[in-house]
């Protein structure tokens, strides 16, 4: 009982002390501000609960005169503070200071000598124009400095002296026009540098060499057109780099090869037109690759992504012109799990592309104009366990009979095993005006089974095969045509032709040089009959092909009193010989060639020719053949009739089913009519590019009355 008064006095003393501290705390907290304990993450991402004074968005004109002594985080964002005066009352434990969105115009107006424990300083969206020498040297413990979205145009070489513990530096969205490697001499421990969205003219070799511990570099939105080969030398610990939203026209593969520990690469939103062979190769630690939102990207070529043993994900989405991925584009990627190819212009994806990725688990190819034919049959043949992402958004665009259907619902047996080449319409423009002396490239790619061969035809009719190199032209093995030093003589129509054993496709581009075509020379057109047989005529022609459109059309008309038959084909302008077949013996034909020009004029010429008559031995041979053929057909029909009769008599079979079978059998020819004629005939009868044609017409003038 004697201890009871003592206990009461102790408890009363504690209560009074707590009350006094609470009153002091309330008195110390600046007017209108909020003072409380809040969660906070240090620059090292360590969680802590910090004493926070929140004075954001209060319209303050000056720095608070008095703060609680235990303040660790001070938030002064969105005020009108223009200067921080020296004070002896700065909290000694202040580690975070946010002065974003104020009126600070000079770092010299920020007196921070009494804040040695600061770890993070935010000066975003102020009016700072320069960083003079040693301007923040008192902040020896500073780890984060945000000066983005200011008006910085000048940074002195020694501006960051004293900040040897700095880990993160944000300088993006200022007015810097160059990067000085001397800035970084005082920052040996810097891990993250963001310097994008500045009007930097160029990056120089060794620009970042002092940053030996840098792990992340963001150089986004500064209109870079190239990266020097040695620009990234010295960044041995760099793991992530972003060149987002620049003007790179090709992958800076030489510079990237020198970042040996790179894991994440962002090249999104650059006008790169091709991912070429070796662009991403032998990058042993790369895990993720981003090539999204590239407005000019057309193709990913053979072995473009090769020997990346740790790569897990490729994102190549929202590229409006990406229409071709080579079957061997992705090679030696043993750990690739995710392939994102949605929202491009892909009509197909080769099975070989998928087969080369042994660990692939998911693929996204929806929102592409898929052509449901031979190339994508594999998707529905149950030959893969890969998960298709958003399969309900995967639709056929061609052919017409499958248009609008879900790709995964079209049975693979309904798709042909081989198919015509298709050159993507996005490959290159139909018309282009260039300046004399300029350099241009046209990227022609086509999908088909079997894989097509690609070549080009010049306005002069010259045929340029892959790997052809001349003074003016170079055709890459993938189908790209380079024209060097364009002159008015190189103006005219250039045609890319993709062909395989099924047929061909072509796409042309009309080039004007300084807004005009080559001068019209009113060239002539000559026709020559080179060979005449009973059932064929070999015709050749010679024209001033400089002014020809680079496609031709041949039409043969056969007239009798009661019949009219026509055959047609269109072939490249480099072909000046054509064999008219399936003609009648001893028949006079009128063969006409009609050539439209780039000046919308026509060259037309006709010749008359009579096919040879049949030799008596040939007549007898044909007669015997006809008799034999009729006998075979009669026998075949007899066998079919017996089968039908047996089918009708059988109680287990339906007679109507037999009739249906015969009817279907007779309606389906056992061979394609296209096999009787050159492959281009059926292709061009559909009327594609009818305006760019050369017509060869053969019309019957006299038909013999006695063929025996």
Curated annotation (Swiss-Prot):
Kindly list the places in or outside the cell where this protein is found, as annotated in its UniProt entry: Membrane
Q: Which residues cross the membrane?
A: 629-649
Its recorded name reads Leucine-rich repeat neuronal protein 3
| Keyword Transmembrane attributed | yes
Asked if ATP-binding is a keyword of the record, the answer is no
- Annotated GO CC locations: extracellular matrix; extracellular space; membrane
The record's annotation in CDD domains points to: FN3 (cd00063)
Source taxon at top rank: Eukaryota
The cross-references to InterPro entries, in alphabetical order and at most eight, read: Cys-rich_flank_reg_C, FN3_dom, FN3_sf, Ig-like_dom, Ig-like_dom_sf, Ig-like_fold, Ig_I-set, Ig_sub
Q: Which Pfam families match?
A: fn3, I-set, LRR_8
- Cytoplasmic compartment segments: 650-708
Q: LRR repeat positions in this chain?
A: 70-91, 93-114, 117-138, 141-162, 165-186, 189-210, 213-234, 237-258, 261-282, 285-304, 310-332, 335-358
The Fibronectin type-III domain covers 523-617
The family database entries (SUPFAM superfamilies) matched by this protein are listed as: Fibronectin type III, Immunoglobulin, L domain-like
Q: Which SMART domains match?
A: IG, IGc2, LRR_SD22, LRR_TYP, LRRCT, LRRNT
Q: Which residues form the LRRNT domain?
A: 23-69
Q: List all annotated glycosylation positions.
A: 93, 103, 223, 382, 522, 579, 608, 624-625
């Amino acid at each position: 009982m004697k201890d009871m008064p003592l206990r009461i006095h102790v408890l009363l003393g504690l209560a009074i002390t707590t009350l006094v501290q609470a009153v002091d705390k309330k008195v110390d907290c600046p007017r209108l501000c909020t003072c409380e304990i809040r969660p906070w993450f240090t620059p090292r991402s360590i969680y802590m609960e910090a004493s926070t004074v929140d004075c954001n968005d209060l319209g303050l004109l000056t720095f608070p005169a008095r703060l609680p002594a235990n303040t660790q985080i001070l938030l002064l964002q969105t005020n009108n503070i223009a200067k921080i005066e020296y004070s002896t009352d700065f909290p000694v434990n202040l580690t975070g200071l946010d002065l974003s969105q104020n009126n600070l115009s000079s770092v010299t107006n920020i007196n921070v000598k009494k804040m040695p424990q600061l770890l993070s300083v935010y000066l975003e969206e102020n009016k700072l124009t320069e960083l003079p020498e040693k301007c923040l040297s008192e902040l020896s413990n500073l780890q984060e400095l945000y000066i983005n979205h200011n008006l910085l145009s000048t940074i002195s070489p020694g501006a960051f002296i004293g900040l040897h513990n700095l880990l993160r530096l944000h300088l993006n969205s200022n007015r810097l026009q160059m990067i000085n490697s001397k800035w970084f001499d005082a920052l040996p421990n810097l891990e993250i540098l963001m310097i994008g969205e500045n009007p930097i003219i160029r990056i120089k070799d060794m620009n970042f060499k002092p940053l030996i511990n840098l792990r992340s570099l963001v150089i986004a939105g500064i209109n870079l057109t190239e990266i020097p080969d040695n620009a990234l030398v010295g960044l041995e610990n760099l793991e992530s780099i972003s060149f987002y939203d620049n003007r790179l026209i090709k992958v800076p593969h030489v510079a990237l090869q020198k970042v040996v520990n790179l894991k994440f690469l962002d090249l999104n939103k650059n006008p790169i037109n091709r991912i070429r062979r070796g662009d991403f190769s032998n990058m042993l630690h790369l895990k993720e690759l981003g090539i999204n939102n590239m407005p000019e990207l057309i193709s990913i070529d053979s072995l473009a992504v090769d020997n990346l043993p740790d790569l897990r994900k490729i994102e190549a989405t929202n590229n409006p012109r990406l229409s071709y991925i080579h079957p061997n584009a992705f090679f030696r990627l043993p750990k690739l799990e995710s392939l994102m190819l949605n929202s491009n212009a892909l009509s197909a994806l080769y099975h070989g592309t998928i087969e080369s990725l042994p660990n692939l688990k998911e693929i996204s190819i929806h929102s592409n104009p898929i052509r449901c034919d031979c190339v994508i049959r594999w998707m529905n043949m149950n030959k893969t366990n890969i998960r298709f992402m958003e399969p309900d958004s995967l639709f056929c665009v061609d052919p017409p009979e499958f248009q609008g259907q879900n790709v995964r619902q079209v049975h693979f047996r309904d798709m042909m095993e081989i198919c015509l080449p298709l050159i993507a319409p996005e490959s290159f423009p139909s018309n282009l005006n260039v300046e004399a002396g300029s350099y241009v490239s046209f990227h022609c790619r086509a999908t088909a089974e079997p894989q097509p061969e690609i070549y080009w035809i010049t306005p002069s009719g010259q045929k340029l095969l892959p790997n052809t190199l001349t003074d003016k032209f170079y055709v890459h093995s993938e189908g790209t045509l380079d024209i060097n030093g364009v002159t008015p003589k190189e103006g005219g129509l250039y045609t890319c032709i993709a062909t395989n054993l099924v047929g061909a496709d072509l796409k042309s581009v009309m080039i004007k040089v300084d807004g005009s075509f080559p001068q019209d020379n009113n060239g002539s057109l000559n026709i020559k009959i080179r060979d005449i047989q009973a059932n064929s005529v070999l015709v050749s022609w010679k024209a001033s092909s400089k002014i020809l459109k680079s496609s031709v059309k041949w039409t043969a008309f056969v007239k009798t009193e009661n019949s009219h038959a026509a055959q047609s084909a269109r072939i490249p302008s480099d072909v000046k010989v054509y064999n008219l077949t399936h003609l009648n013996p001893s028949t006079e034909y009128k063969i006409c060639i009609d050539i439209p020009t780039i000046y919308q004029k026509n060259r037309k010429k006709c010749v008359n020719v009579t096919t040879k008559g049949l030799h008596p031995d040939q007549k007898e041979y044909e007669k015997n053949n006809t008799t034999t053929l009729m006998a075979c057909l009669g026998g075949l029909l007899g066998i079919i009739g017996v089968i039908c009769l047996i089918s009708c008599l059988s109680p287990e079979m339906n007679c109507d089913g037999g009739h249906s079978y015969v009817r279907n059998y007779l309606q389906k020819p056992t061979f394609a009519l296209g096999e009787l004629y050159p492959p281009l005939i059926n292709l061009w009868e559909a009327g594609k590019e009818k305006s760019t044609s050369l017509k060869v017409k053969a019309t019957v003038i006299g038909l013999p009355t006695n063929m025996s």
